[in-house]
């Protein structure tokens, strides 16, 4: 009975969520689009010509936002967007999507092959592992996903590149923040208005690598 009530409450909340309604009006595939929009505006990120990697992209709302901001004359993308997710994603014009598990070495190598020698301006990650409800196990899964995004970013970002990653408050969060601060000069925490009040999610915005692998002139 409690589970059924929870389901009804969630449906009621979802239907009456202003961001759900706004996403439908704007044509975004998910309300999460507004989380990224706010972060990009506050941090003054993303310009035409940028190379962006979207990790955990399905259903595609973040890629939609990036595409809008990189669109030039005629709606053609001025830049590059590479998206990856474990789940399938309906095509978005100008977005290079492929399906796979980012935790799989073969998938990671394929992503790196697609990026090639192009230095990345922005990595965005809305990835979240399946949670079991067991605190220690869930914290380890969350940290692992964040670490993977961090390592990829450190290897492929421009020196002044930026990583936006979803994390969750709780056990292990401080360790995630510390690992980001060891690699980036500036790390801030953002809780967009579109994040639900009861959610423990937060977004880390890390910029300016301390020890960049790629040269600024790499294209």
Swiss-Prot record:
Q: What does this protein do?
A: Specifically methylates the uridine in position 2552 of 23S rRNA at the 2'-O position of the ribose in the fully assembled 50S ribosomal subunit.
Protein residues bound to S-adenosyl-L-methionine:
60, 62, 85, 101, 126
For this UniProt entry, what's an example GO CC term?
cytoplasm
Family, similarity comment: Belongs to the class I-like SAM-binding methyltransferase superfamily. RNA methyltransferase RlmE family.
Q: What subcellular locations does the record give? A: Cytoplasm
The record lists the organism as: Bordetella avium (strain 197N)
Provide this UniProt record's keywords sorted from A to Z.
Answer: Cytoplasm, Methyltransferase, rRNA processing, S-adenosyl-L-methionine, Transferase
| The protein's enzyme class | transferase
Keyword Ribonucleoprotein appears in the UniProt entry: no
SS bonds (residue pairs):
none
> Which GO molecular function terms does the record list?
rRNA (uridine-2'-O-)-methyltransferase activity
**Catalytic activities:** uridine(2552) in 23S rRNA + S-adenosyl-L-methionine = 2'-O-methyluridine(2552) in 23S rRNA + S-adenosyl-L-homocysteine + H(+)
Coiled-coil positions are none
The positions flagged as active site in the entry are 166 (proton acceptor)
One Pfam family cited in the UniProt record for this chain = FtsJ
Name the chain's protein. Ribosomal RNA large subunit methyltransferase E
Q: What is its EC number?
A: 2.1.1.166
């Amino acid at each position: 009975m409690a589970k059924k009530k929870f389901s009804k409450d969630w449906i009621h909340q979802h239907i009456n969520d202003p961001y759900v309604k706004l996403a439908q009006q704007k044509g975004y595939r998910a309300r999460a689009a507004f989380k990224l929009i706010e972060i990009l505006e506050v941090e003054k990120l993303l310009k035409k010509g940028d190379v962006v990697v979207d990790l955990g992209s399905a259903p595609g709302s973040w890629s939609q936002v990036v595409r809008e901001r990189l669109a030039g004359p005629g709606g053609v993308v001025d830049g590059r967007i590479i998206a990856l997710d474990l789940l399938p994603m309906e095509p978005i014009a100008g977005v290079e999507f492929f399906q796979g598990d980012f935790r799989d070495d073969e998938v990671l190598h394929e992503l790196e092959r697609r990026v090639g020698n192009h230095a990345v301006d922005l990595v965005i990650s809305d990835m979240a592992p399946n949670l079991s409800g067991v605190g220690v196990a869930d914290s380890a899964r969350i940290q692992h996903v964040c670490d993977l995004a961090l390592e990829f970013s450190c290897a492929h970002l421009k020196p002044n590149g930026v990583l936006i990653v979803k994390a969750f408050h709780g056990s292990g969060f401080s360790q995630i923040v510390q690992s980001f601060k060891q690699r980036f000069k500036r790390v801030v925490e953002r809780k967009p208005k579109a994040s639900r009040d009861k959610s423990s999610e937060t977004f880390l915005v890390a910029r300016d690598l301390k020890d960049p692998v790629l040269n600024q002139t790499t294209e």
